[in-house]
UniProtKB/Swiss-Prot annotation:
<dbReference type="GO" id="GO:0005576">
    <property type="term" value="C:extracellular region"/>
</dbReference>
<feature type="glycosylation site" description="N-linked (GlcNAc...) asparagine">
    <location>
        <position position="47"/>
    </location>
</feature>
<dbReference type="InterPro" id="IPR005018">
    <property type="entry name" value="DOMON_domain"/>
</dbReference>
<keyword id="KW-0964">Secreted</keyword>
<dbReference type="Pfam" id="PF03351">
    <property type="entry name" value="DOMON"/>
</dbReference>
<feature type="glycosylation site" description="N-linked (GlcNAc...) asparagine">
    <location>
        <position position="128"/>
    </location>
</feature>
<feature type="signal peptide">
    <location>
        <begin position="1"/>
        <end position="18"/>
    </location>
</feature>
<protein>
    <recommendedName>
        <fullName>DOMON domain-containing protein Y73F4A.1</fullName>
    </recommendedName>
</protein>
<feature type="domain" description="DOMON">
    <location>
        <begin position="26"/>
        <end position="143"/>
    </location>
</feature>
<keyword id="KW-0325">Glycoprotein</keyword>
<keyword id="KW-0732">Signal</keyword>
Length: 182
């Protein structure tokens, strides 16, 4: 009976360590958390040069169709812009007339970009896109920017499978970090 109870606990009680609330590699790092039904995303890119863009995309993937995007770009004059948009078909990004993400902080030091944005966790923007369900996230490391237009990206896309952002609350992240320290 005792063994059955232990098996039940492991099978039916979700582990807090299985929640993905961050991503990091040699080029980009980001983490996200939810508070008061808003998601805040802190994103860093280690080599965003002038006239380049990078983005975070959300959707089924791994193909580039029907993805919702947050796009960060660096113009020739070092101005950083943040847009929201979507990809109705591969190789084409349609930028929203009004971005539905709020920029909380942005810094550029050399070629290192640090930006923190927030948006509603639930339906937002012209397509009522929601991040409250588990879905795939993709990081597009970059592409060129020409006359304000986003050109095709180059290089590998980083794929983060089944992100359940709604589970990334401060309390849960603290528990996960405490478990990692053990």
């Amino acid at each position: 009976m005792f063994v059955l109870a232990i098996v039940f606990a492991f099978v039916f009680i979700p582990s807090s360590s299985s929640v993905t609330c961050d991503f990091k590699n040699e080029l980009v790092s980001m983490n996200w958390n939810v508070k008061n039904n808003k998601i805040q995303i802190h994103f860093e890119h280690n080599n965003l040069t002038e006239n380049r863009w990078t983005s975070i995309a959300f959707g089924d993937g791994p193909g580039m169709n029907n993805l919702e995007s947050i796009i960060f770009s660096r113009r020739e004059d070092n101005v950083i812009t943040t847009n929201s948009g979507y990809t109705p078909k591969k190789k084409k990004v349609v930028v929203d007339d009004v971005s539905y993400v709020t920029v909380n902080d942005v810094q550029i030091t050399g070629n290192k970009l640090k930006v923190t944005v927030s948006r509603p966790l639930g339906p937002a923007g012209p397509r009522n896109f929601s991040l409250d369900q588990c879905l795939n996230w993709m990081v597009v490391p970059g592409g060129s920017l020409s006359n304000g237009k986003f050109k095709k990206h180059h290089g590998k896309i980083f794929f983060i499978k089944d992100v359940c952002a709604a589970k990334c609350t401060a309390e849960r992240i603290q528990r996960i970090n405490s478990n990692k320290a053990l």
